[in-house]
Amino acid sequence: HWMPVDYYNGADHAVAHLLYSRFWMRFFYKLGLVPTPEPFKRMMYNAYIMAPDGQKMSKSKGNVIDPMEIMDSGYGADALRVYEMFIAPYDMDAPWDPRGVPGTYRFLNRAWNLVQEFVDKDPNDSLDANEKTAQELLRLTHSTIKKVTRDIEDEKFNTAVASMMEMVNGLYKIKESHGIDMSDEWRFALESLIQILAPFAPHITEELWREMGHDDTVH
């Protein structure tokens, strides 16, 4: 009664899974047992993260990347998750780059520092951004929300991460030009960044959401 569904799996399973799932669904449909001949609304095949040398990871070859070692080395789970989403399109094989996790770790640190600078401001500081700053913040935030939303819906996770990186860069440029204040526009920009980043980096965003004064979860 819950068919059809979305289907996600590795390309190496495609032939067998499609053969048997579609065969049985069409067989049941002809018997009048199910309402549709197709079991899937949408099919997506995920690619592989290869070893740094471009070969498939294998224990026998000794080229497997251990995620626990990366997390325990000080980078944490979120930097690893973000890099896995950023490394390549969902359906394209890509070699592991040892420089990748340090890069996403720096990105998350920059986002963290922006939020910390905002929450550490004196509450008596200016509550109003000047008109130019307000427009820049709103334009950057809304355009990023639109791009990230579209990319997530299309499973383009790597470009979603790239858009969030561009947003952080843009926020730093605005900060360097006009500073950070306690305005609604800065709050909106930072809270929006936290919310769109949450599916990719759930741990740091939960902490940042609390830092922004929320008692509920960001998820």
Regions found by a protein language model. Give the residues of each.
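Alpha-helical recognition segments enriched in aromatics with Gly/Pro capping
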Residues: 1-92
